[in-house]
Amino acid sequence: MKKDREPIDEDEMRITSTGRMTNYVNYGAKILGDEDKKSIKIKATGNAIGKAVTLAEIIKRRFKGLHQITRCGSTVITDQYVSGQDNSEHVVQEKTVSFIEILLSREQLDMKDAGYQPPLDEKYVKEMTPEEIVNSRPFRRGGFRPRFYRGFRGGRGGFLRRGGYRGFGDRVYEPRSSFRGGRGSGYGGNFGRGGYRSGGGMGGGFRGGFRGGFRGGRDGGYRGGNRGGSRSGFRGGRGGFRGGRALS
């Protein structure tokens, strides 16, 4: 069921969590670029509040002398829809959500208002036309790109040779290997490619030093060293440590 939408003024912007910031900045710049428009009002609810605050800060840094008044609180939103197989049941639901209203104006606003903010210092403002704002570097590629997807990599160190740890490289996620020990960070005589490696499957589990230490079998469990296990406790690699005699 469609519900009647409240009329929106020409100088008003209603921000949604799915809207593109580029479009909002472009529209806001066009409003303030008009000589007849002295103010702009930005409204948002719920998850879109953060985007509305970001939009206001961008506009304030592109137009000089903008006074600001911010109001926030909670409001009740009513959703109406029909249910049932024959769409005969009329359902009304009410929910309380947070909202924010940001008024930016070239004219002086009430300085006694609790949400009043004076214009930014001109040294922090770089005036641009609407076209220059959209074509500027932060917006040419549709916003910023975070770098967390590159994972992390430990430096040299760890245990003897090239220890440390490695993240999941340049891939977002690789289910076969979550993290991998660096070289030489496990038990074993020669300290070859040791460390530990997570993940199941064949050859998974823990992998110790150079053919020694702990090594996970195909079905999990432990397999000691080269020929360890039930015959001789557990046995490390070359130069590692060796358990006692087999139990009779």
Curated annotation (Swiss-Prot):
Main location: nucleus
Organism superkingdom: Eukaryota
Compartments where found: Nucleus; Chromosome, Telomere; Cytoplasm
Keywords annotated in UniProt: Chromosome, Cytoplasm, DNA-binding, Nucleus, RNA-binding, Telomere, Translation regulation
Phenotype caused by lack of the gene: Attempts to knock out the gene were unsuccessful, indicating that disruption is deleterious to parasite intra-erythrocytic growth.
Location of region: Disordered: 217-248
Cross-referenced Gene3D superfamilies: Alba-like domain (3.30.110.20)
Pfam annotation, one family: Alba
A molecular function (GO) term: RNA binding
GO cellular component: chromosome, telomeric region; cytoplasm; nucleus
Keyword DNA-binding set for record: yes
Signal sequence segment: none
Entry's Gene Ontology BP terms: regulation of translation
Subunit structure comment from the entry: May form homodimers. Identified in a TARE6-associated complex consisting of over 30 proteins and including ALBA1, ALBA2 and ALBA4; the complex binds to the non-coding subtelomeric repeat region TARE6.
Functional summary from the UniProt entry: Possesses DNA- and RNA-binding activities. During the asexual blood stages binds to a sub-population of mature mRNAs and regulates the timing of their translation. Binds to DNA with relaxed sequence specificity. Associates with the subtelomeric TARE6 repeats.
Family as reported in the entry's similarity comment: Belongs to the histone-like Alba family.
PANTHER family in the cross-refs: FI09323P (PTHR13516:SF4), RIBONUCLEASE P SUBUNIT P25 (PTHR13516)
Protein name: DNA/RNA-binding protein ALBA1
Organism: Plasmodium falciparum (isolate 3D7)
Originating gene: ALBA1
